[in-house]
Amino acid sequence: YKPGERWHYSVAVDVTGLVIERISGMPFDQYLEKNIFAPLGMDDTFFEVPEDKTDRFLPNHFWNAKAGELGTMPVQNNTAMSDYMTVSLHSGGGGLVSSTMDYMRFCEMLRNGGTFNGARILSPKTIKFMTSNHLTKSLSASTGGEDPIAAAFPGVGFGLGFGITLDPVLTQTLGSAGNYSWGGAAGTVFWIDPVEDMIVIGMIQLMGSPWNLRQDLGIAAYQSILETNE
C-alpha cells in the first residue's frame, strides 16, 4: 500500500537500517558508532557485548506465576541473552545493549533538539517531525488497517520511532500531551516530556511482569513535580 493509506507495526526500521548501509557504504553497527554513539560519548552501547564487559551484562528475569516468584535467566544458558555475545545480524529494529547513562545521553540529545556533548546529531526540525503524531483518524483498526498501538495504549499515536501521547486521560496515567516514548519486551521504558522538560528512563529486566510498572513509574515521577510548566 502507499504511504498514508495504511499503518502496520512492521520491520520497517530494519529495512531502514539496510538502506543506511546501502547509502553510507558502511556496516550498520559501524555507522551507528561513528555517527551517533561516539559523538554522544555512549561508550557502553553496542550490538555485541565486549569480552571485557560481560561481567556487567545483567541477566534477564521472568515472572513464575505458578510459584509466585521471580526467576533468573542465566546469560550463558539463555538464547535471548547469549545471542549478544556473538552477533551476525545488526538489526535496525532491536538488538542493541546499553546502559542507563548511555541511554540518558541519547535522550538528552533528543530533548535538546538534536545536540548533546558538543555534537549535532539531528536538526531541531527533524526532532519535531519525528516526535509528532503521523497517524490520522482514518488509520485506525476499523478503517485503515492494523493499529495495535491504539488498541494496546489508548490515547497514544505514533511518530517516526516513538509512541506519542495524545490524551493523557485516555492513557490512564499521569503525563503530558506530546510525550514521546517507547518500551521493550522486558519492561525497559523511556519517555521525554517536552512540557515539563523531563526525561524518565526505566531499565527493567523482567519478562511477563504481572505489574503495571510503567504506569507506576509515571505516577511516581509526576507526583514529585510541585510546580508544573502547564
Predicted features along the sequence, with ranges:
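Residue-level detector of beta-strand structural context in well-folded domains
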Residues: 160, 188-190
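Short, structured beta-strand/loop micro-motifs enriched in basic residues and often containing a Trp
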Residues: 181
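Short, small/polar residue-rich loop motifs at catalytic or cofactor-binding pockets
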Residues: 184-186
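Short, well-ordered beta-strand elements
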Residues: 190-192, 197-206
